[in-house]
């Protein structure tokens, strides 16, 4: 699945949410039988309900240019304020949601170069691995525990995010 999307538009309302839910259910059903490989490779990134679809994939491949998060930078800035999250600060945005930090924090399986051949090779490697014994989302209790114990009183930085979700 090539996942380059800002998510459902607010004007799509319940119809958009239902479509996303159908996609989620299809991924969960399919991944029992064959690896479902997600790829985020462009500058649009993957946000909203489709970022959940990305997390449901058996394997997730990103490039350095990719971004992955539940809410996009503009949405966070609108809700939290520019002092909290400046969507124009590209180094900050990529330090929090970019492909490299998502890989280093264990939320994706492969970080590859920005080219068709690199992405294709990683996709073929993921398919060759077959269905994982345990999917990332099967570890929800571990992620919930980590988030519950995280101090949210101050703005997190990339190093804290990497430490919070460090690969074990």
Where are each of the predicted segments found?
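Substrate-binding cleft of extracellular glycoside hydrolase catalytic domains
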Residues: 4
